[in-house]
Amino acid sequence: HAVGGGLEIAMAADIRIARKNSGKVGLPEINLGVLAGTGGTARLTRLIGKAKALEMMVTGELMSFEDAHACNLINHIWEGSPEDFRRDILDWCSQFTLPNKAVKAVGNIKRSCQTGPEIPFEYHLALERELQAALFNSTDAKEGIAAYVEKRVANFTGN
């Protein structure tokens, strides 16, 4: 389950993955006479939209992982066994780390995506250009471009 504060913590993550048929999500704080005040109202609204977030929080109802996936609160539902879940997810996540991806590029993508919606569009474009310019000077960008031209898999080092 990811309920209350647990969901508030999960919503701070870049990607949320749940194991199929293993729980529910929700912010039932209304049933205690309070609100999800550790980023819950702000993050849920941004993730799933105002109307669905309001409905979820004012009813206090929990939703299945499948329903949470349908409204983009969960990115992926994993069908593996409970015993293999952690290992499978760590294996899956390795695609975003060295040597498979350039970590500076991953970081800059995250920065642009997280900051962009909070600033005017033209500033977002300027931020994107600034982040891209910094990446073009990296060893990893040179490796990635060379690997593409040479039709081979890049071996990123984090530089």
Protein language model features and the residues they cover:
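Well-ordered beta-strand positions
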Residues: 15, 55, 59-61, 67, ...
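Helix-turn-helix DNA-binding module
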Residues: 5, 69-71
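Short alpha-helical scaffolding segments that buttress acidic/His motifs in well-ordered protein cores
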Residues: 56-57, 109-113, 148
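CoA-thioester-processing core
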Residues: 3-57, 88-92
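C-terminal long alpha-helix characteristic of the crotonase
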Residues: 18-23, 65, 74-126, 139, ...
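Hydrophobic alpha-helical segments typical of transmembrane helices
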Residues: 40-43, 52, 105-108, 128-131, ...
